[in-house]
Curated annotation (Swiss-Prot):
Pathway involvement of the protein, from the record: Cofactor biosynthesis; adenosylcobalamin biosynthesis
Cited function: Part of the energy-coupling factor (ECF) transporter complex CbiMNOQ involved in cobalt import.
Transmembrane segments: 6-26, 43-63, 85-105, 108-128, 133-153, 181-201
GO biological process: cobalamin biosynthetic process
Lineage: Bacteria, Bacillati, Actinomycetota, Actinomycetes, Propionibacteriales
A GO cellular component annotation in the UniProt record: ATP-binding cassette (ABC) transporter complex
Species assigned in the record: Propionibacterium freudenreichii subsp. shermanii (strain ATCC 9614 / DSM 4902 / CIP 103027 / NCIMB 8099 / CIRM-BIA1)
UniProt-recorded name of the protein: Cobalt transport protein CbiM
Quaternary structure, from the entry: Forms an energy-coupling factor (ECF) transporter complex composed of an ATP-binding protein (A component, CbiO), a transmembrane protein (T component, CbiQ) and 2 possible substrate-capture proteins (S components, CbiM and CbiN) of unknown stoichimetry.
Gene: cbiM
Length: 235
């Protein structure tokens, strides 16, 4: 998904930077508030960032100028809500661009918009909807991980299509081609990421159950950690 350096025209790079900036600034404020008012959640915050960094560093060949990989942003979206992931995702993308040659600085705005903004919001929306409908926690986590990944690549496909429209079918035709290529690798990766998310949250409930309870990650309407942690072990 990381669009490489020099792939997008300068004007489009500037547009994506401008589109991402308000979300990132708001996210930075939320991260500072989270650390200041809830210092006990710093390890969970670090876990969310590490998950995004590690999973999105897996680089598989795909569309020229981009790549396929999991995103890992669903974890942070479920734990701390999407605004936090806008800022943390930007930090991850900067490190990857500078240290791993994964992505680029000029395309940082576009990559942030797709992976750190749209992906977390779509995944979180699915998680909340599942919760309101009374679905199991495991399903909500799976959907958050699965859809945050897929939606990221949908946005990336259109970003590339705007830069390289098809001569005959235009932007929509190009987007269809990019989506088709990404789907080959990304659908299986998204499913695997969803399953990994369930396993990760099982572990987190065992080691940080009270913190997850306080963040609102719970089964049903029960509020006591003792009642919920054993149940999560079987989701």
């Amino acid at each position: 998904m990381h669009i490489a350096e020099g792939v997008l025209p300068p004007v489009q790079c500037a547009i994506w930077f401008a589109a991402a900036a308000p979300f990132v600034v708001h996210g930075a404020v939320q991260v500072v508030k989270q650390i200041k008012h809830h210092p006990e959640n710093r390890l969970l915050l670090a876990t969310a960032g590490a998950c995004t960094f590690l999973l999105s560093s897996i680089k598989l060949p795909s569309v020229t100028g981009s790549s396929s990989h999991p995103t890992g942003t669903g974890v942070g979206a479920v734990l701390f809500k999407p605004p936090v992931m806008a800022f943390m995702g930007l930090i991850v993308l900067i490190f990857q661009a500078l240290l791993l040659a994964h992505g680029g600085i000029t395309t940082l705005g576009a990559n942030t918009f797709s992976m750190a903004i749209v992906g977390p919001w779509v995944g979180y929306g699915a998680y909340v909807l599942n919760k309101k409908l009374g679905g199991p926690l495991a399903l909500g986590i799976f959907l958050a991980m699965f859809l945050s990944d897929l939606s990221t690549y949908c946005v990336t496909s259109f970003q590339l299509a705007f830069a390289y429209p098809d001569p005959s079918s235009g932007v929509l035709g190009a987007a269809e081609k990019f989506l088709g290529i990404f789907a080959i690798s990304q659908i299986p990766l998204s499913v695997a990421e969803g399953i990994l998310g369930i396993l990760l949250f099982r572990f987190l409930f065992k080691v940080a159950g009270p913190q997850l309870q306080a963040l609102g990650v719970r089964i049903g309407n029960k509020r006591t950690a003792n009642a919920e942690v054993p149940e999560v072990a079987h989701v």
